[in-house]
């Protein structure tokens, strides 16, 4: 089931060719369970961010804005950014000693929980042999075979170091293979910070209130065409207006960088047909959705096979990683097999490969995605019901271990709809939940994530906290 974004207080689904079972199973036996160590009253009395404030003020003299990625500065939600000291399971602890149930999960990679014992042990063994070789290693073969066997579209894969790198490489490859330069992306979809993609790019720029980024030459985006998400007619018009010039259509199959937005069946099926009819490639950016919506990603979930796919986050188990892959005839254009050049000093490094291998092994265990679906449904519906009880218009949805909610009536089908959300109210909600010991993404325009480490106790605590906070707003 795919949950649409409605204002009804429930997550309603539309039918699709999903391979996900809706059966509810018990949680995998290996998931981490960490008890809340203090009561709600004790937590609120002890909550302070003094050390975080001091460290952040010092950081602002050392790094632009005090951070190394803009959303971490809390610009769109206000308040004091927290500096994290340690993580384990579903929890994080800041340098002031505050404990949080975490629904960011390092922005997606921590699907089996933070600092998993098996992953840490495997990394320790790998590090005894070295941290980087700058040469091929057997671990690359192992992870490549796992990715190829899991993701329907991938017959060959190239590992890189980030989602941005993956999207840069896949766009260059699409242009090389088709010998066309224009491509279509969607408003609110984020594909990294390469120049060609920084047009109506979703959360990365929405957080700062900017439509794009200074420093991006007009020439770099002259071949970037944009359309509203879920608007297949707009895409058809672009193909008509630029006949024979469009190399590819790239999208987040479920948007995570405008908040959480799902595709309509007409839209996602229509894209597959339009690209085939016009000699263009369909690219799924599955940096967020890969191995999260299903073991085979969004393409398995929806039953739509693109020509090329980008991956990241989960396949590195929390270490820097990215990948792009697809049909063999396309991938054989990548150097050194073919003329399309792309390289990387740390690509395929043994640490990221190790963490990825052990993360995917865990995800392949029976009951994994049924458990994620169960707890995420409970969480999302609980938060929406809390909004209903306290008189706050909200809408939201979920698929497997990915979810989102907006302070808006809904429904939300695209970035224009998402921007109608009450961001001031979201900021109040975010800050209130932080004091309650719950860490959501510090932006209305970001999806949230659950993990195998989240327990029913975590979910119930979060729902109760949401009702308390919403009751005070």
Curated annotation (Swiss-Prot):
GO biological process, one term: chlorophyll biosynthetic process
Transit peptide interval: 1-37
Keywords linked to the UniProt accession: Chlorophyll biosynthesis, Chloroplast, Isomerase, Plastid, Porphyrin biosynthesis, Pyridoxal phosphate, Transit peptide
PROSITE patterns, sorted: AA_TRANSFER_CLASS_3 (PS00600)
Record InterPro entries: 4pyrrol_synth_GluAld_NH2Trfase, Aminotrans_3, Aminotrans_3_PPA_site, PyrdxlP-dep_Trfase, PyrdxlP-dep_Trfase_major, PyrdxlP-dep_Trfase_small
One GO cellular component, as annotated: chloroplast
Annotated catalysed reactions: (S)-4-amino-5-oxopentanoate = 5-aminolevulinate
GO function term, MF aspect, one: glutamate-1-semialdehyde 2,1-aminomutase activity
Cofactors named for this entry: pyridoxal 5'-phosphate
Annotated compartments: Plastid, Chloroplast
Highest rank taxon of the organism: Eukaryota
Pathway the protein takes part in: Porphyrin-containing compound metabolism; protoporphyrin-IX biosynthesis; 5-aminolevulinate from L-glutamyl-tRNA(Glu): step 2/2; Porphyrin-containing compound metabolism; chlorophyll biosynthesis
Class of this enzyme: isomerase
EC number: 5.4.3.8
Modified residues (N6-(pyridoxal phosphate)lysine): 313
Subunit structure: Homodimer.
Family of the protein in this entry: Belongs to the class-III pyridoxal-phosphate-dependent aminotransferase family. HemL subfamily.
Alphabetical list of PANTHER family matching this protein: GLUTAMATE-1-SEMIALDEHYDE 2,1-AMINOMUTASE, GLUTAMATE-1-SEMIALDEHYDE 2,1-AMINOMUTASE 1, CHLOROPLASTIC-RELATED
Protein name: Glutamate-1-semialdehyde 2,1-aminomutase, chloroplastic
């Amino acid at each position: 089931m795919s949950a649409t974004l409605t204002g009804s207080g429930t997550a309603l689904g539309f039918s699709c060719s999903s391979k996900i079972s809706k059966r509810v199973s018990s949680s995998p036996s290996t998931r981490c369970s960490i008890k809340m160590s203090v009561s709600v009253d004790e937590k609120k009395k002890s909550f302070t961010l003094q050390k975080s404030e001091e460290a952040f003020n010092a950081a602002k003299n050392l790094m632009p804005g005090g951070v190394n990625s803009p959303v971490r500065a809390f610009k769109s939600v206000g308040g004091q950014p927290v500096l994290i000291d340690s993580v384990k399971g579903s929890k994080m602890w800041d340098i002031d000693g505050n404990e949080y149930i975490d629904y960011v999960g390092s922005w997606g990679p921590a699907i089996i929980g933070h600092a998993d014992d098996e992953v840490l042990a495997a990394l320790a063994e790998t590090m005894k042999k070295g941290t980087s070789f700058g040469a091929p290693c057997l671990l690359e073969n192992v992870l490549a075979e796992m990715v190829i066997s899991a993701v329907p579209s991938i017959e060959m894969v190239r590992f890189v170091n980030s989602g941005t790198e993956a999207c840069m490489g896949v766009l260059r490859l699409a242009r090389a293979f088709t010998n066309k330069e224009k491509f279509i992306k969607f408003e609110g979809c984020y594909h990294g910070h390469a120049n060609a993609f920084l047009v109506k790019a979703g959360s990365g720029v929405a957080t700062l209130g900017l439509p794009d980024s200074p420093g991006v030459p007009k020439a770099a985006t002259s071949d970037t065409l944009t359309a509203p998400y879920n608007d297949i007619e707009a895409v058809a018009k672009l193909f008509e207006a630029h006949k024979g010039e469009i190399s590819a259509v790239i999208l987040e199959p479920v948007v995570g960088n405008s908040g959480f937005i799902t595709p309509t069946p007409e839209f996602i099926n229509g894209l597959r047909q339009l690209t085939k009819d016009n000699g263009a490639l369909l690219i799924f950016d599955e940096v967020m959705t890969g191995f999260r919506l299903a073991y085979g990603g969004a393409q398995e979930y929806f039953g739509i096979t693109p020509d090329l796919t980008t991956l990241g986050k989960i396949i590195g188990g929390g270490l820097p990683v990215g990948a792009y892959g697809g049909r063999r005839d396309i991938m054989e254009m990548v150097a050194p097999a073919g003329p399309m050049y792309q390289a990387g000093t740390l690509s395929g490094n043994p640490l990221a490969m190790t963490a990825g291998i052990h993360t995917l092994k865990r995800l392949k265990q029976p009951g994994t995605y049924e458990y994620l679906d169960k707890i995420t449904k409970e969480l999302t519906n609980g938060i929406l019901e809390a909004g209903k009880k306290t008189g706050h218009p909200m809408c939201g949805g979920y698929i497997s271990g990915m979810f989102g909610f907006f302070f808006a009536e809904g429904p939300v089908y695209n970035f224009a709809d998402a921007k109608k959300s009450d961001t001031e109210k979201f900021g109040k909600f975010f800050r209130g939940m932080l004091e309650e010991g719950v860490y959501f993404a510090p932006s209305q325009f970001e999806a949230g994530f659950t993990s195998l480490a989240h327990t029913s106790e975590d979910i119930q605590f979060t729902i109760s906290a949401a009702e308390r906070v919403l009751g005070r707003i």
